[in-house]
């Protein structure tokens, strides 16, 4: 099992500089991570720097609130792909979910999935803002909309992934949709908990620390 391929090496801070983007790109290339996940403004640069590697470029759409219009999310998606994005992590309309406007939530996801045709789409449901039933419903809508992954968190809402939420999401979507855990995965112990709960992708700024922990662990 190639654990490095579980990791989306992530830098989404608004103050991220080109120097910091260079650092995570260099680290991702060194460890052969699945992707680097950066804000849309950095996608074109990252794609150019990663053109000679297997590392993919992931970006975020409707981030971090999910409260932009569907048309805006579609434009962001098309623009990101034109700039070289391989994977799209979008945020759902959280307020619509809480209102019970499930058709609106699903159509929002479907529009991004259509705009990103041929590219992986991960749907951020922001678990820290949801109760048990809302996590289940958001996961069901993600699956119904044809997305590839359901993802826990933006990291901007005061909480991140928990193993319990990851398991609930995985139990809900089954084998057809994967689960990405993000937010607060800082070391090998956190990583292992998420993978054991059913995550097959981990969004983390601590990818290097996780891999160093794996290298130091005689079980791997």
UniProtKB/Swiss-Prot annotation:
Entry coiled-coil feature ranges: none
Entries under InterPro entries matching the protein: Aldolase_TIM (IPR013785), DeoC (IPR011343), DeoC/FbaB/LacD_aldolase (IPR002915), DeoC_typeI (IPR028581)
Listed EC numbers: 4.1.2.4
Localization terms from the record: Cytoplasm
Pfam families: DeoC
Gene3D superfamilies associated with the record: Aldolase class I
Main location group: cytoplasm
Pathway membership: Carbohydrate degradation; 2-deoxy-D-ribose 1-phosphate degradation; D-glyceraldehyde 3-phosphate and acetaldehyde from 2-deoxy-alpha-D-ribose 1-phosphate: step 2/2
GO CC terms of this entry: cytoplasm
Keyword Endoplasmic reticulum: no
Record family assignment: Belongs to the DeoC/FbaB aldolase family. DeoC type 1 subfamily.
PANTHER family in alphabetical order: DEOXYRIBOSE-PHOSPHATE ALDOLASE (PTHR10889:SF1)
Name by which UniProt lists this protein: Deoxyribose-phosphate aldolase 1
Organism annotation: Staphylococcus aureus (strain MRSA252)
Lineage: Bacteria, Bacillati, Bacillota, Bacilli, Bacillales
């Amino acid at each position: 099992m190639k654990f490095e391929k579980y990791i989306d090496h992530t830098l989404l801070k608004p103050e991220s500089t080109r120097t910091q983007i260079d650092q995570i790109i260099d680290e991702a290339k060194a460890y052969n991570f699945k992707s680097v996940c950066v804000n849309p403004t950095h996608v074109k640069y990252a794609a150019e720097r990663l053109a000679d590697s297997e590392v993919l470029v992931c970006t975020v759409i409707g981030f971090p609130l999910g409260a932009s219009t569907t048309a805006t999310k579609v434009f962001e998606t098309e623009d990101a792909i034109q700039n070289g994005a391989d994977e799209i992590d979008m945020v759902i309309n959280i307020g619509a979910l809480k209102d019970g406007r499930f058709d609106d939530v699903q159509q929002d996801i479907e529009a991004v999935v259509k705009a990103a045709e041929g590219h992986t789409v991960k749907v951020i449901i922001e678990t820290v803002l949801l109760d048990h039933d809302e996590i289940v419903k958001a996961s069901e809508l993600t699956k119904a909309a044809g997305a590839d992954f359901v993802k826990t968190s933006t990291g901007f809402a005061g909480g991140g992934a928990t193993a319990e939420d990851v398991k609930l999401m995985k139990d809900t979507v089954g084998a057809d949709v994967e689960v990405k855990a993000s937010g607060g995965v800082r070391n090998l112990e956190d990583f292992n908990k998420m993978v054991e709960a059913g995550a097959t992708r981990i969004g983390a700024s601590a990818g290097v620390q996780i891999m160093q922990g794996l290298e130091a662990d005689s079980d791997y």
